[in-house]
Amino acid sequence: MSKEFEVPRSVEWEENHINILNQQKLPAETVFEHLYTKEDVYDAIVTLKVRGAPAIGITAAFGLALSAQDIETEDIDVFKQEVIQIKEYLNSARPTAVNLAWALERLLRRIERAASVNAAKTDLVHEAIQIQIEDEETCRQIGQNALQLFKSGDRIMTICNAGSIATSRYGTALAPFYLAKKKNLDLHIYACETRPVLQGARLTTWELMQGGVDVTLITDNMAAHTMKEKQISAVIVGADRIARNGDAANKIGTLSLAILAKHFQIPFFIAAPLSTFDVSTKDGSDIPIEERDPLEVKEFNGVQIAPPDVQVFNPAFDVTPHHLISGIITEKGIITSNYTEEIDALFAENISL
């Protein structure tokens, strides 16, 4: 690991298991766990031991490749049917992050013409590893493209964690901050805590500090005051799914930041790879929004903080309409207007996606 980049990887492929950084333990402990079965992988995704759209996709791809090694048949058609069943099981872990389905579908395409079970098993492993390799370069390029939007001295706000541990390396929304550090550009980050699971407080501040990036933590309800008093230059966030018209689903609270940024005339950017786009989804109204366990809101670290019988509404994501977005930063460039047309053109140029 390079001296200027000290953030551990969130997921790695091993000979007979998957090694993950348990993000539920951060920042108090840095704990790595081994996943051996598809059930282990499913549980790790559902319980947020692994989270972040690209990291979820990589982990699921590894999970499919790993589980396929245990399929006992020499019939390639039977093998493919069992792989499809594993794919459908893993795909049900989280409904909003489109990278999950994208990665699994990519593995299925890889073995469409496989002549033997052994060849298919090898191909699945190679393709899953290739997804991780490509994601690192994709994130680095997103960071390079985003960096041109900022100058030394800028104060930038973010929410949730769209960083290195949410991807293979660097992250999406946080990628420019690591690259800025390497180039000695002075950027200061304001990280919203991100209730109720506190990904901003627990993960973003932790990894930015690991990487030597200047960061200040704020509570979510301090965002407006901070934008005004600290003269925030821009807001940059990640995304879990982007519709064809540019509407973007991201962690709950993102929409609030976009509305506030519009009020204060602050640029609001989404940073995401092309694999996060779902061109089959016309607009944000068609994006499924995951609702999570009410205990995430009623308890903190096992301690009750609300009446046990109170009703809870706990959506994990919200959708920011494209008209509130100043630009979508991808590995292929920055989309700044006419989102449907530009997204269509982008995918026409990259038909393999």
UniProtKB/Swiss-Prot annotation:
Gene3D superfamilies hit by this protein: translation initiation factor eif-2b, domain 1, Translation initiation factor eif-2b, domain 2
Origin superkingdom: Bacteria
Keyword annotations from UniProtKB, A to Z: Amino-acid biosynthesis, Isomerase, Methionine biosynthesis
EC number of this enzyme: 5.3.1.23
Pathway membership, UniProt: Amino-acid biosynthesis; L-methionine biosynthesis via salvage pathway; L-methionine from S-methyl-5-thio-alpha-D-ribose 1-phosphate: step 1/6
Active site: D240 (proton donor)
Family affiliation: Belongs to the eIF-2B alpha/beta/delta subunits family. MtnA subfamily.
NCBIfam families: eIF-2B_rel, PRK05720.1, salvage_mtnA
Function: Catalyzes the interconversion of methylthioribose-1-phosphate (MTR-1-P) into methylthioribulose-1-phosphate (MTRu-1-P).
This protein's name: Methylthioribose-1-phosphate isomerase
Originating organism: Bacillus pumilus (strain SAFR-032)
Designated gene of the protein: mtnA
